[in-house]
């Protein structure tokens, strides 16, 4: 392709994204374009033989081991998906990860989130009195759930977002919870002397690069008999740095800085057991994440004027920028919905792994 044609194509895609941000492209057209992108990504990642598929996974894992723990923390420190207003968190349900939609009777984010968090507790074998660490705790939905459910436990959450810390501590005060500590820190740099009975890492490893270094760091915070429950989004077969595959790959290009998001394969983390050992592994349908985003989209649309005012006040932006930010969130929900419901939720999935600490043995 000539340089002129490439420049024209880039310009067309930039115009497309600008029109999407302004809400000038219909949801139906966005979904159609997303499906085209999904099929291109599947074609790119799916190899003709199982041996080639395995080789792709092993090469990907090898490349991760040569990287630093994470590349995006500074880039995304004030990213709009993390630094969000308290009132907006309440509108969307307070959690960016998937809820558990076990059947058609589950319709609200609150119910789905509670079901998923109860599943975490069950699979981690939580008991009242356990010390618990929630890495990348976000707006604190899991922290608060655990603090209310396990009154004798001490729950520590780590977030790199000051507004989230303030919100969680405010909720603890309102709920009269005294068993919560929130640490404001970059998880890749923070040093904690304490060790914990249970560690939760929900929707965080997708923002890491060197999984070996990350899991080694976590293992140092686990008691000898401690357990780690880790959840991540995944593809059934291939791992992906989520970089644009071409100039028209608008959805991979515009939501996160290029290459800062990792979507591992369903089996990727099984190859990183230097410091922790997998003792159980579950795969949940991608429909859970698809429906979560569908519900969030409806909640945003149902209070769109309120959301606009919230964004203008919190970020100190004008009406046009607030509209763009609302459309950014809407587009994120639409694309995630299409991605995770593809192939009836059996293409992109949710992986949950339970690890124990690997203890040093003397010979």
Swiss-Prot record:
Q: Where does S-adenosyl-L-methionine bind?
A: 96-97, 132-140, 159-164
Which reactions is this enzyme annotated as catalysing? Answer: (S)-reticuline + S-adenosyl-L-methionine = (S)-tembetarine + S-adenosyl-L-homocysteine + H(+); (R)-reticuline + S-adenosyl-L-methionine = (R)-tembetarine + S-adenosyl-L-homocysteine + H(+); (S)-corytuberine + S-adenosyl-L-methionine = magnoflorine + S-adenosyl-L-homocysteine; (S)-tetrahydropapaverine + S-adenosyl-L-methionine = (S)-N-methyltetrahydropapaverine + S-adenosyl-L-homocysteine + H(+)
Q: What are the coiled-coil residue ranges?
A: none
InterPro entries this protein is in?
SAM-dependent_MTases_sf
GO aspect biological process, one term: methylation
Q: How does activity depend on temperature?
A: Optimum temperature is 30 degrees Celsius.
What name has this protein been given in UniProt? Reticuline N-methyltransferase
**Organism in which the protein naturally occurs:** Papaver somniferum (Opium poppy)
């Amino acid at each position: 392709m000539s340089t002129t044609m490439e420049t024209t194509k880039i310009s067309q895609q930039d115009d497309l994204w600008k029109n999407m941000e302004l809400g000038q492209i219909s949801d139906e057209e966005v979904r159609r374009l997303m499906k085209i992108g999904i099929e291109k990504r599947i074609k790119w990642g799916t190899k003709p033989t199982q041996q080639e598929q395995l080789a792709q996974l092993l090469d990907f894992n090898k490349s991760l081991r040569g990287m630093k723990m994470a590349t995006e923390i500074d880039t995304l420190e004030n990213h709009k998906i993390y630094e969000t207003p308290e009132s907006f968190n309440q509108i969307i349900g307070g959690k960016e990860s998937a809820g558990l939609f076990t059947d058609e009777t589950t319709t609200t984010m609150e119910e789905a989130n509670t079901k998923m968090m109860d599943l975490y507790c069950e699979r981690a074998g939580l008991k009242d009195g356990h010390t618990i660490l929630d890495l990348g705790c976000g707006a604190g939905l899991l922290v608060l759930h655990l603090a209310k459910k396990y009154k004798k436990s001490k729950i520590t959450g780590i977030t790199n977002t000051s507004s989230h810390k303030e919100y969680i501590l405010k909720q603890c005060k309102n709920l009269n919870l005294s068993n919560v500590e929130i640490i404001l820190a970059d998880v890749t740099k923070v040093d904690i002397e304490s060790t914990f009975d249970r560690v939760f890492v929900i929707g965080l490893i997708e923002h890491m690069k060197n999984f070996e270094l990350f899991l080694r760091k976590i293992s140092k915070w686990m008691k000898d008999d401690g357990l780690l429950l880790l959840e991540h989004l995944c593809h059934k077969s291939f791992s992906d740095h989520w970089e644009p595959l071409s100039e028209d790959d608008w959805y991979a290009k515009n939501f996160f800085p290029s290459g800062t998001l990792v979507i591992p394969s369903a089996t990727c983390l099984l190859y990183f057991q230097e410091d922790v050992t997998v003792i159980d592994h579950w795969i949940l349908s991608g429909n859970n994440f698809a429906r979560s985003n569908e519900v969030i989209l409806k909640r945003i649309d149902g209070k769109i004027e309120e959301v606009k005012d919230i964004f203008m006040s919190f970020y100190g932006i004008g009406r046009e920028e607030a509209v763009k930010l609302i459309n950014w969130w809407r587009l994120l929900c639409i694309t995630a919905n299409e991605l995770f419901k593809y192939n009836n939720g059996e293409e992109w999935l949710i992986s949950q792994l339970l690890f124990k600490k690997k203890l040093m043995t003397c010979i």
